[in-house]
């Protein structure tokens, strides 16, 4: 049974953020099969609707049974029944913020608007000391979203990403909610021996 405190509906000036439902599988498939959208994400584009349905079930639908969570379908207000993206906080000690958005919606500030709304909901719900996010150094626009919602870059590390089997340098961003401002979660720093601190200016 789904928990009503998990992923409560949110509205912003241009967006509706809601839970995914099984009927969203075709729209999610369109997003997950786009090679450009998924270029910097840690999975290959999905090939079939069945794969998208499995992704939807495992990463979204099944998670709504837990006590709290923030795993949203991002919809335009004028078309609330069709997701154009997703934004979520992953379970685990990193409290990692992740997101994806279809290409026709890029460069309009929509993901910043969605991510900011989720961060504010996390603050209202309480319980998380900080949020983190990472982006491939070759994808600085994703880092722009992180900066726009108040995150700052704390360090960079190199990781071999599965299943793509590629070495990637990631910038690690953090936003402290209840921790002191200078607190840095070092989980990725400690688990990846190739790491450094960049002068990124943010």
Model-derived features: positions:
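A short hydrophobic/aromatic micro-motif that marks alpha-helical segments and, especially, helix-coil
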Residues: 20, 48-50, 63, 165
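Acyl-donor (CoA/ACP) binding surface of acyl/acetyltransferases
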Residues: 1-39, 71-202
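Conserved GNAT-fold acetyl-CoA-binding loop/helix
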Residues: 36-58
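Sparse recognition of residues in long alpha-helices and their boundaries
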Residues: 44-45, 68-69, 162
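Hydrophobic residues in alpha-helical segments
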Residues: 32, 41, 63-65
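A short helix-loop-beta-strand connector motif used in the catalytic cores of GNAT acetyltransferases and
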Residues: 59-73
């Amino acid at each position: 049974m789904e928990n009503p405190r998990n992923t409560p509906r949110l509205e912003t000036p241009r967006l509706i953020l809601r839970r995914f439902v099984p009927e969203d599988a075709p729209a999610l498939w369109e997003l997950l099969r786009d090679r450009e959208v998924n270029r910097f994400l840690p999975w290959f584009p999905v090939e079939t609707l069945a794969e998208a349905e499995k992704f939807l079930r495992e990463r979204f639908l099944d998670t709504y049974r837990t006590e709290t969570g923030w795993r949203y379908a991002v919809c335009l207000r004028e078309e609330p029944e069709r997701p154009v993206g997703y934004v979520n906080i992953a379970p685990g000690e990193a409290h990692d913020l992740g997101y994806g958005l279809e290409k026709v919606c890029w460069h309009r500030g929509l993901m910043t608007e969605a991510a900011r709304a989720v961060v504010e909901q996390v603050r209202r719900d309480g319980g998380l000391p900080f949020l983190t996010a990472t982006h491939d150094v070759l994808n600085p626009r994703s880092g722009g979203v992180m900066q726009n919602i108040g995150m700052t870059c704390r360090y960079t590390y190199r990781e071999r990403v599965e299943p793509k089997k590629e070495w990637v340098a990631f910038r690690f961003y953090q936003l402290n909610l209840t921790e002191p401002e200078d607190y840095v979660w070092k989980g990725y720093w400690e688990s990846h021996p190739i790491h450094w601190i960049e002068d990124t200016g943010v």
